[in-house]
């Protein structure tokens, strides 16, 4: 397991970034999709470690400050030389699966495309607390259903 955002030495990500670049390069031709899940930020992208990016999916909690942070990251995408076909936002852990007017206003202010709203769910909390993979959530779980809906809408 490769964990981004943790240094191998004082302030240096070189080893981890080199490892990521080599592994993605070796495997890219064998897969239709490669998902890179990382902590907030664009370091490994800005350093040119990934050969190309088709989609950037930004995930935020259901707060105005979270949306503002995602907006700042979205504005960095062109500065990093990326030209993804799709840039979008998923709001996670929304109470009742609904975003309020303030959060919706901030999404519009940040000029973000809303891909979907994932509800806060006790089932996910229970699975996580028990160490059970969330991939085992039942098909009728609202989080699972929303994620399938988002994936279908991406059209990748």
What are these regions (language model features)?
Residues 1-10:
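Conserved P-loop NTPase mechanochemical-coupling segment
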Residues 3, 90, 135:
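Residues in well-ordered beta-strands of folded domains
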Residues 8, 44, 134:
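Short, flexible micro-motifs
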Residues 13, 100, 140-147:
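Generic structural signal for well-ordered, non-membrane alpha-helical segments
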Residues 14-117, 126:
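Conserved catalytic-core segment of NTP-binding enzymes
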Residues 122:
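Acidic phosphotransfer microenvironment of two-component signaling modules
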Residues 130-141:
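C-terminal boundary of histidine-terminating zinc-finger modules
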Residues 146-156:
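C-terminal alpha-helix
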């Amino acid at each position: 397991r490769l964990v981004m955002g943790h240094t191998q030495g004082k302030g240096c990500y070189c080893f981890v970034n080199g490892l990521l670049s080599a592994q993605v390069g070796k495997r890219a031709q064998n897969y239709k999709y490669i998902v890179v899940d990382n902590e907030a930020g664009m370091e490994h992208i800005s350093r040119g470690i990934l050969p190309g990016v088709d989609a950037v999916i930004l995930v935020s909690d259901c707060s105005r400050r979270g949306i503002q942070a995602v907006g700042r990251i979205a504005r960095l995408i062109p500065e990093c030389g990326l030209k993804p076909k799709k840039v979008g936002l998923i709001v996670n852990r929304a109470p009742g699966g609904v975003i309020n007017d303030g959060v919706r206003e901030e999404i519009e202010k940040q000029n973000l495309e809303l891909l979907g709203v994932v509800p806060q769910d006790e089932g996910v909390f229970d699975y996580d607390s028990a160490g059970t993979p969330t991939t085992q959530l039942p098909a009728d779980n609202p989080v699972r259903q929303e994620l399938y809906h988002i994936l279908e809408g991406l059209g990748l």
